[in-house]
A protein has these predicted regions:
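Sec-dependent N-terminal signal peptides
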Residues: 1-5
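C-terminal motif of bacterial Sec signal peptides marking the signal peptidase cleavage site
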Residues: 7-10
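Bacterial signal peptide processing site
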Residues: 12-15
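Short amphipathic, basic-aromatic surface patches that mediate peripheral association
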Residues: 17-19, 30-58
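Extracellular distal adhesion/interaction modules in secreted or cell-surface proteins
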Residues: 21-27, 278
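A short, amphipathic beta-strand motif
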Residues: 27-35, 203-209
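Tryptophan-paired
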Residues: 50-134, 193-196, 202-331
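Extracellular beta-sheet/turn segments enriched in Thr/Pro/Gly and aliphatic residues
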Residues: 130-197, 206-208, 319-355
Length: 355
C-alpha cells in the first residue's frame, strides 16, 4: 500500500489516512495520506516581506515604484513615479500639495511594474477614480500560462480591460501596498512609509518517497487573474489553469524533492462536511468551486502501474480549518508529503490508479 503524508505550514499533526484497495499485479495496493499543518503567516501580518519573493537573487528588489494618491472624494490627486531601488519598508516624502492640507487621503503603491507612463491610458479616462483603480488586475499571458506567475511574463490590466503594461522582470515579484486614512500635513508634504507585500502566494512542496518512485507532480486549478488591491475575492471573469507536470529524472525519483510554486489568491467555498484530512477530496468540493490542488504521480516499488495522489491546498493551518481551502496572499504554504507503502488495505478517496 502507498501512503502519502502531508504537512502544511502550521502546527498540529493528523495521521488519519484511509486507503483504497486496488488490484495491481501482485496484490492489493493501498494509498494513504497524513497531513501535518505547520506555521503560517496569518492574514494581516506584514513581517518578513522581503523573503517572500520569486528569486533569491532578487529577493530585496523593489524599484519602478508608482504611488497614486486619491482624495476623500475618490478622485485622483497625484501620481508619483520613482525608478530607483529602495529597501522595504520604504519611507518617502510626498508633496501632495498645500491645497489638500488636512484632507484624508488613500495612498496606493505598486512596485516592479512598468515605467513612468504606465498609467498614461488611465489618465485619459474621465472616470479615473479610486474605485476604478481598485479594479487593477494582474493576468498571466496566454503563451506562458499560470507558470508565468513565478516565471516569464505577467500583464497588468485596468478595470475596463486595457492592457497597461507587460511585466518582464520575472525574478522580482509585483509588490503592492495601500495606506488608508492618511492626513495631509499643513504644508502639503506628507511622509509615507510603504510596506510592500508580494502579489502572489508561495507554495513549497516537500515530496518524500518511501518504497516508491515519484514520477511527476504539478499544481492545478490556479486562477489566471488576480486583483492587485482588492484582495479577498477572485476577479469575476477569472479562468483557471494548471502548471505543466514537472517530470522527475529517473535517478532522482526515489529522492526527496523540494519545489516552490507561485500562484494567485484563490477564494472558494469551504469543503462540504470535512472533519478529517481524507474528507478533503474531489467528491466533497462544492459545485462550481475551483480550489487549488497538487497532483503527485508515483510507482510503488515492485509495481509498474502509476498512481495519482491529489491533495487540495489552502487552510489546514490547524485542525479547525479542515474545511477551509482558500489560498490567501498573506500566507506561505509549505506541504510535506510522504508517499510510501503502508499495507493495511484501507482506502483513501484522494488516490486513484492512472489508467
Amino acid at each position: 500500500m502507498i501512503v502519502a503524508g502531508m504537512m502544511t505550514t502550521s502546527c498540529s499533526s493528523d495521521n488519519d489516512g484511509v486507503e483504497q484497495q486496488t488490484n495491481n499485479q501482485t496484490g492489493v495496493i493501498a494509498l494513504k495520506a497524513e497531513v501535518v499543518p505547520m506555521n503560517t503567516l496569518q492574514e494581516g501580518e506584514r513581517t518578513d516581506t522581503r523573503s517572500r519573493v520569486i528569486s533569491a537573487e532578487y529577493e530585496n528588489t523593489i524599484n519602478n515604484i508608482h504611488i497614486v494618491v486619491f482624495g476623500s472624494d475618490g478622485k485622483k490627486i497625484k501620481h508619483f513615479y520613482s525608478p530607483m531601488y529602495v529597501d522595504n519598508p520604504y519611507t518617502t516624502l510626498l508633496n501632495i500639495g498645500s491645497s489638500h492640507a488636512g484632507e484624508t487621503v488613500t495612498i496606493y503603491a505598486i512596485a516592479n511594474v512598468g515605467d513612468a507612463d504606465m498609467f498614461e491610458n488611465l489618465e485619459n479616462v474621465t472616470d479615473y477614480t479610486q474605485t476604478a483603480f481598485e479594479g487593477l488586475n494582474l493576468r498571466v499571458s496566454a503563451t506562458d500560462g499560470v507558470q508565468s506567475i513565478g516565471q516569464g511574463t505577467q500583464l497588468l490590466y485596468s478595470q475596463a480591460g486595457t492592457n497597461l503594461t507587460t511585466i518582464n522582470n520575472a525574478e522580482a515579484p509585483v509588490m503592492v501596498t495601500k495606506l488608508e486614512n492618511v492626513t495631509v500635513a499643513n504644508n502639503g508634504l506628507t511622509r509615507a512609509t510603504l510596506s510592500f507585500t508580494r502579489q502572489n502566494t508561495k507554495i513549497t512542496l516537500n515530496l518524500i518517497p518511501q518504497k516508491m518512485k515519484i514520477v511527476k507532480y504539478r499544481v492545478c486549478s490556479i486562477p489566471k487573474i488576480s486583483y492587485v488591491f482588492s484582495k479577498g475575492t477572485n476577479v469575476p471573469e477569472v479562468e483557471y489553469g494548471d502548471i505543466p507536470y514537472v517530470e522527475v529524472p529517473a535517478a532522482d525519483q526515489s529522492k526527496q524533492i523540494k519545489q516552490a510554486f507561485y500562484v494567485y489568491e484563490n477564494y472558494n467555498e469551504n469543503i462540504v462536511g470535512a472533519v478529517k484530512q481524507t474528507d478533503r477530496c474531489e467528491a466533497n468540493i462544492p459545485n462550481g468551486a475551483h480550489p487549488t490542488y497538487v497532483e503527485i504521480v508515483g510507482i510503488p516499488d515492485g509495481f509498474t502501474d502509476q498512481y495519482l495522489y491529489r491533495v487540495y491546498l489552502g487552510g489546514v493551518s490547524s485542525q479547525n480549518e479542515i474545511q477551509y481551502h482558500k489560498i490567501t496572499l498573506l500566507r506561505n504554504y509549505e506541504y510535506y508529503v510522504t508517499v510510501k507503502l503502508a499495507g493495511d488495505g484501507t482506502g483513501d478517496p484522494r488516490v486513484s490508479k492512472v489508467e
